[in-house]
Amino acid sequence: MYAIAEDTLPARVLKELLLYRRRYPEHRQSASEADEIRRIEQVQLPRIAAFIEAGEPIEFVLPAFPAKSPNPGKVLDSRPDMAERLSLSFLNHLCQRIQLFYAPGAKITVCSDGRVFGDLVRIGDAHISAYQDALRLMIEEIGATHIGVFNLEDVRAFEAQRDNHEQLRQLLIGGYAEPLESIRETLLASEEGLLLYRAITRFLYEDGLTPDYQGSKTALQRDAKERAYGVIQRSWAWGALLADQFPRAIRLSIHPQPADSLKFGIHMMPTRDDWLTPWHGVAVNTEDRFVLMKRSEVLELGGELVQINGQPSHYRLPARAARRAAVA
């Protein structure tokens, strides 16, 4: 067991992360949080300490920010908005807080994964490219100097196929993906695997409920269940590639993770849904803070659209509705 004093630099860094940890909601009552933290410490403290002992910036990677959901019941439109802006600002501020007590600081590489599974989530490559370009511009606009971006087309070994997005996906699958049957077996073998599979299935089902969808909900659900295996296969392949590209980096995740995982699940905005992300929701200005919600939920509460520079940005809730939407 890795033992480390509570007042050491690695422990202080981990405490910053723990403030925003994504936990499985199903585990909140059944698992001891103290026991979970002890298990997290055993995994993460030695990895954080390795950077500090070398006097280097602590390196994080975060597979995230693929593209906006195609469902207008969840998001404003296809462009990054206040939800992304606040999330990127949070990530940059997290690095700044670490730098207050550890001078070399930290850096986070956002590994945008839209290109990885865009065909499976039925978002076109042109939309993914536009989202990625807007995301880079947003990072510059907010002065997020601690954040970098890495995409599938940035992999040096794939450089010859940089403009052939389908071939890039095939190179990823061929080099890093496990067989689909193996993915199925792994997911069905644990509670965490089932939770992930159900969450991805739900995302795909909800994203498919667009105004122009003409099929039955049963057919869409069946299709989402099948595509979910492929999305997870690609996501895990992307993770394996990132482990090659950033072998020492601490892996952050937008999903809840087991306490003994190498991945650390992190919230970028307050939300009642531990699976909701900025690209599946909208930013909502309540009485005292911004929270993340689905657009349809905000509209039911009477949310008022706010535009910035002529573009839809976020929603504002009346005081009474804001109290109903309060996030614990």
UniProtKB/Swiss-Prot annotation:
Record key words, sorted: Lyase
Catalytic reactions of this protein: D-ribulose 5-phosphate + L-tyrosine = (2S)-3-(4-hydroxyphenyl)-2-isocyanopropanoate + hydroxyacetone + formaldehyde + phosphate + H2O + H(+)
Record keyword Lyase present: yes
Enzyme class: lyase
Molecular function in Gene Ontology: lyase activity
Disruption phenotype: Disruption of the gene maintains the ability of the strain to produce the pyoverdine siderophore. Disruption mutant cannot produce paerucumarin.
Keyword Lyase: yes
Xref: Pfam families: DIT1_PvcA
EC number of the protein: 4.1.99.24
Assembly and interaction partners: Monomer in solution.
Family: Belongs to the isocyanide synthase family.
Biological role stated in the UniProt entry: Involved in the biosynthesis of paerucumarin, a cyclized isocyano derivative of tyrosine. Responsible for the synthesis of the isonitrile group on tyrosine using the C2 of ribulose 5-phosphate as the source of the carbon atom.
Name used for this protein in its record: L-tyrosine isonitrile synthase
Lineage of producing organism: Bacteria, Pseudomonadati, Pseudomonadota, Gammaproteobacteria, Pseudomonadales
